[in-house]
Amino acid sequence: VKLIYFNGRGRAEPIRMILVAAGVEFEDERIEFQDWPKIKPTIPGGRLPIVKITDKRGDVKTMSESLAIARFIARKHNMMGDTDDEYYIIEKMIGQVEDVESEYHKTLIKPPEEKEKISKEILNGKVPILLQAICETLKESTGNLTVGDKVTLADVVLIASIDHITDLDKEFLTGKYPEIHKHRKHLLATSPKLAKYLSERHATAF
């Protein structure tokens, strides 16, 4: 398995995390922005991330669309729930997280002053409402993770998005949203591989 993306977390991080949590070894190829114009014509659809999977016969399957890739990997490794009800809750959480990500994306590729202004607007606007909705979903769980105590794609996309919010304001979550803090603690305790990956992850701009 080879994952190709820029040298950042961004849209590829949930894919990296689900691969790590599933125990799948993969090549993490990172492209610098200055090299992208040369490489872009060789990428299907001209967008990243993509994943290349080589089967036992040596045939290579190229996959695009970050969430579709993450869902494919999660389903393959039984991380999309054991019942229809669990599947619904996982998809509900993914949708709630995507709402948070839509707000975060407003801050990307902006000059520092404008980014700071937009960050304050979203952190004082929609984000608290969206995070509270996520907390309500976590409260409904029968365990410590999104569905019970089993790691799923919902858990991975949630902590990846929370890291983006923390990037905008390191103190934003302090003393608030206890369910989100509890969720992260239990996720890392449940998945030592993921905890190790996060502890060793290099800091990047996004």
Curated annotation (Swiss-Prot):
It catalyses: RX + glutathione = an S-substituted glutathione + a halide anion + H(+). The lineage of its organism: Eukaryota, Metazoa, Spiralia, Lophotrochozoa, Platyhelminthes. The keyword Transferase applies. This is Glutathione S-transferase class-mu 28 kDa isozyme. GO terms for molecular function: glutathione transferase activity. PANTHER family: GLUTATHIONE S-TRANSFERASE. It comes from the Eukaryota. Transmembrane segments: none annotated. It is an enzyme of class 2 (transferase). One of its GO terms (biological process) is glutathione metabolic process. Residues 1-81 form the GST N-terminal domain. Belongs to the GST superfamily. Mu family. Residues 83-206 form the GST C-terminal domain. Keywords: Transferase.
